[in-house]
Amino acid sequence: MAKLEPDDVVLVAILPELRDLEIARVLGWYRIPLKSAPKMIRVDWIAFYLTAAFGDEKWSIRYLAPVMGYELVSRGELLADDPDHPYADEPYYKVAVGPLVQLTHPIPARRWRRITFLYTTGDKLLAARDVKELTLKRSSANAVR
């Protein structure tokens, strides 16, 4: 199993539905619409920020996975069981992920926060006790690959 290193680049990404967690766990990928994608997809890890759909686990980071690669495909290719979706032809990043790792200490957002994507580092992720502690200072953010 991959080990999170202190200087690894981590993309914190929203996980809107239970189905998305199962896709990551079972099929080994996560989807990001190209039109709302962060500037940098080439990261070492992806950490998942859980939404209200996760009940008692909402608004927290509990899982992460190593990023194995990515490709650009249509939403319809990713979710063939939903061919009539309004965004079926839209381009999405299919981010291949390795096995999910459950954090020893979940990272809650003590106050609700609207998060789509943010970058952090392995050391910040392992030390954080609140999601707000993950944000990189401007000089650190510029140094990220």
Where are the model-predicted features located?
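Structured alpha/beta reader/binder surfaces that contact nucleic acids or chromatin modification marks
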Residues: 2-145
